[in-house]
Amino acid sequence: MAHSVGIKDVARAAGVSVGTVSNVINRPDTVASETRARVLSAIDRLGYVRSESARQLRAGRSRIMGLLVLDMGNPFFVDVTRGAERAARDAGLGVMVCNSAQSTGEEAEYLALFAEQRVRGVLLTPTDASGRNIDAFRRHQIPFVLVDRVAEGTTECSVSVDDVAGGALAVRHLVDAGHRSIAYVSGPSGLNQVRDRRTGALNALAEAGLGEDVLRELPTERLDVAAGRDAGARLLGLADRPTAVFCANDLLALGVLQAMFSAGVRVPDDLAIVGYDDIEFAAAAAVPLTSVRQPAVTMGALAAELLLEETEAETASRPHEH
């Protein structure tokens, strides 16, 4: 097996101490030019590559930002990641992306991994409303910013849209189009986003003088296309089928759309569908979906920039207002 070249090998080849090699790498201005040239020549000749990660861990910090999302199969979170990665790269950082797959167990494991790797900070979309994993993560004193989730307390930072207003916008559109029987394909009830969008939908009905019974909820365990197809099948089985559907995200809406096509139901003639997120796939569907837009790339970039502000404030030992 080939020997991995270390700093001691460089020192031996250059005829200097390990400390001198370290100074050439980290503080070259403190080393005489002749000695510095000899060390650099040895580095080139031996092909030495310093262990940046080890150096950073010894210093108690990393140039990696953690990003934990609900579902990397959702184009919304792909766009969030793009925005976060761009902002991190501009700051000289990399991004470690992990997917909780909407599992609190996997979320806990990845947060533990981030702590073990001593990441600079974490961007996180929580899996549920309880915040148990977040509470456990706080003890590591690693800065974090919530993405697509409103912070509950005053000590946390978050980047999100107003999901109550978004839910109201979607249902107001359907009510204005004359619909008086609307289904809400909601997703997991533990997600704040799902609950807030439902609250907004009910607010829109109240504004229109309509009762809550106008909205019929069809919960799903996940926020993906397969769950949308299942909800669509349940919708088709209703005796008094609603004339419109509001879906908690676009993947659910695409699944409902597929179920309707398979059953010969015309969209939007027989059933109107409104999604949420305005992902590119929704606009490219056989029947382009109406959707509430979320600026995912911008949200990711803003969250990363906010996290960098948090880490800088922590390094400077000063309070940071947000």
Predicted regions and their residues:
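Short acidic capping loops at alpha-helix termini that bridge into adjacent secondary structure
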Residues: 180-182, 212-216, 267-272
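Alpha-helical recognition/docking segments in bacterial nutrient-uptake
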Residues: 1-2, 60-172, 176, 237
